[in-house]
């Protein structure tokens, strides 16, 4: 299932909603083979099966879902910030170094910093340079970073 972001982080997959003769509906993922359901269906809608962080599952019509959500592998910088505010790590496909990501630090009573800040973690940096620094330091976005649509959630 692909991950998407809107006002909240959800998981979703393309699916059909079948209306059965008894008035009930059944949601079937596009890649599922359910000929017995298709044979009993009186109508079919195209859309998404959506799973929320608390496990709740629902159905969303295709147009409504695609207007509200964007896959987390092609986010704007603004959506990347929202993802960090929800506790996710983010990175850019356009960065030269692989294995690096950003996190948002929210200070607590033990922190020396008093306001939230973004930092970059380079501990997993994959590079041919044996002298490349590895660690975690505060980070500032460039104009290119802020205007890029290649941000993604790091799993």
Regions inferred by a protein language model and the residue ranges of each:
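Motif-centric detector for short Cys/His coordination patterns
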Residues: 1-97, 106-115, 141, 153-155
């Amino acid at each position: 299932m692909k991950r998407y972001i809107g006002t909240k982080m959800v998981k979703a997959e393309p699916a059909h909603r079948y209306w059965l003769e008894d008035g009930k509906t059944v949601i079937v993922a596009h890649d599922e083979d359910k000929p017995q359901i298709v044979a009993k269906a009186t109508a079919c809608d195209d859309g998404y099966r959506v799973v929320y962080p608390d496990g709740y599952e629902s159905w969303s019509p295709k147009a409504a879902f695609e207007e509200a959500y964007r896959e987390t592998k092609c986010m704007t910088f603004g959506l990347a910030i929202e993802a960090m505010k929800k506790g996710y790590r983010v990175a850019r496909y356009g960065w030269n170094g692989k294995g690096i990501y950003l996190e948002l630090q929210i200070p607590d009573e033990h922190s020396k910093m008093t306001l939230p800040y973004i930092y970059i973690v380079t501990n997993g940096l994959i590079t041919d340079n044996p002298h490349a620094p590895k660690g975690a330091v505060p980070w500032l976005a460039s104009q290119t970073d802020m205007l890029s649509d290649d941000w993604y959630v790091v799993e």
